Structures are given as structure tokens and as C-alpha cells.
Regions:
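Short, polar/acidic, helix-capping and beta-turn segments at strand->helix junctions
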Residues: 1-116
Length: 116
């Protein structure tokens, strides 16, 4: 998921050039919130057993090294929305570009119980 509200990216660009750290962390949080919302829509909140892994992709300038600090914004949202079920193994990966010029993208792998 990317940092969108009502289908529109709220920020675009490259972290360290167009997007500062505060905006990047906020964008990561919004992307994580969107990912959790998609899970809830699919299986309901009670259907989420736990998030197994989160990967945060960050479009950043060459030489950028604060990937984990950006990903902290996403981790905070998982803890806020899911509590202990959101305590997760995490990777933060720097990339050259992301879809539609997004500065971050969050991918979740979750263990779920299908609704009956």
C-alpha cells in the first residue's frame, strides 16, 4: 500500500530530496494504516491473528541510510491499530522509484482466520 487518502497520493517524491524525514515517516504510517484497513475489510479485525512480516520500501536518494527511521512510522501504526498482533518482523528497503512517484510502500504478510 502507498500513502493515499481517497485514492490520491498525499505526498510524492524521493526521500532526502523532495520529502523530508517527518513527511516520510507520516507517509509510512498512512501506507501501513491503508494496509491494515485492507486486511480488516477482507477478514474483519477479529480475523487478523497477527502480522507476520512488514516490508517498507523507501524511494530515497543515493547514500540515504535512515530507512529504519522512516519505517518506524509504519511500525507505530501497526502497534496502535493491532496491539500485540502488530508486533512484527520488519525490513526497510531503499529503492530508486515506487509506483506513481510514492515515497514509500508498505507490504504486510498476515496470518488470518477466514470469516465463516
Amino acid at each position: 500500500m502507498t500513502p493515499r487518502r481517497h485514492g490520491e497520493l498525499v505526498v510524492t517524491g524521493v526521500v532526502g530530496r523532495d520529502v523530508d524525514m517527518a513527511a516520510a515517516r507520516e507517509a509510512a504510517g498512512l501506507a501501513a494504516d491503508n494496509a491494515v484497513t485492507a486486511l480488516v475489510e477482507a477478514v474483519g479485525l477479529a480475523g487478523i491473528d497477527r502480522v507476520v512480516k512488514m516490508t517498507v520500501f523507501i524511494a530515497a536518494v543515493e547514500g540515504f541510510t535512515a530507512h529504519s527511521a522512516v519505517a518506524d512510522g509504519a511500525s507505530a501504526v501497526l502497534r496502535e491499530r493491532l496491539g500485540a498482533r502488530g508486533a512484527v518482523a520488519r525490513s526497510a528497503v531503499g529503492v530508486r522509484t515506487l509506483p506513481s512517484g510514492a515515497p514509500v510502500e508498505v507490504e504486510l504478510v498476515a496470518a488470518v482466520t477466514q470469516p465463516s
